[in-house]
Design a protein with these regions (language model features):
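A residue-level detector for a conserved hydrophobic packing site
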Residues: 38-39
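Glycine-rich phosphate-binding loop
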Residues: 97-110
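Glycine-rich/acidic phosphate-handling loop/turn and adjacent ATP-lid/helix
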Residues: 73-99
Length: 142
């Protein structure tokens, strides 16, 4: 199961920093996707949240309008403005001074967009606020 693998990959870091990851997942939810690509994408999103959170992360996996919705919420400071304002695949204004190159979101959008079903493509978007007040990474797969 995708969530178990991601949680196990981050268990050591989570325990060392005494961070809490809560999982909310709809029961009996099955979806077709490239397992390895989505595990890597989700692992990167969780690792980023662990890097910037204060103490808590919420991993939510639900079905919404015939789509799979995977969200990673954290209680950190949120995403930088340049990342929130970019709808493009490329990150034209990296913040190298703060180690924000935008490559992670670039690859996440490529991976999401490679997942198609009935003429729709997967998407990734970033917001601030969310259930824990910090950044929210949202992956939607058709």
């Amino acid at each position: 199961d995708i969530t178990e693998e991601v949680l196990l990959k981050n268990q050591f870091y989570t325990e060392q920093r005494k961070l809490q990851i809560t999982l909310e997942q709809s029961a009996d939810l099955y979806w077709f996707f490239d397992y390895d690509l989505i595990v890597n994408l989700l692992n990167d999103a969780v690792a980023n949240a662990l890097r910037y959170c204060n103490s808590r992360i919420l991993l939510k996996i639900t079905q919404l309008q015939q789509k799979l919705l995977i969200e990673v919420h954290d209680d950190g400071p949120g995403f930088p403005t340049f990342m929130l304002n970019s709808d493009a695949l490329d990150m034209n204004t990296p913040d190298l001074a703060n180690n924000h190159t935008g490559l992670g979101i670039f690859f996440a959008k490529l991976i999401a967009g490679a997942h198609t079903n009935k003429g729709e493509r997967g998407t990734v978007n970033l917001t601030n606020g969310g259930e824990l007040g910090g950044g929210v990474f949202r992956l939607t797969l058709p």
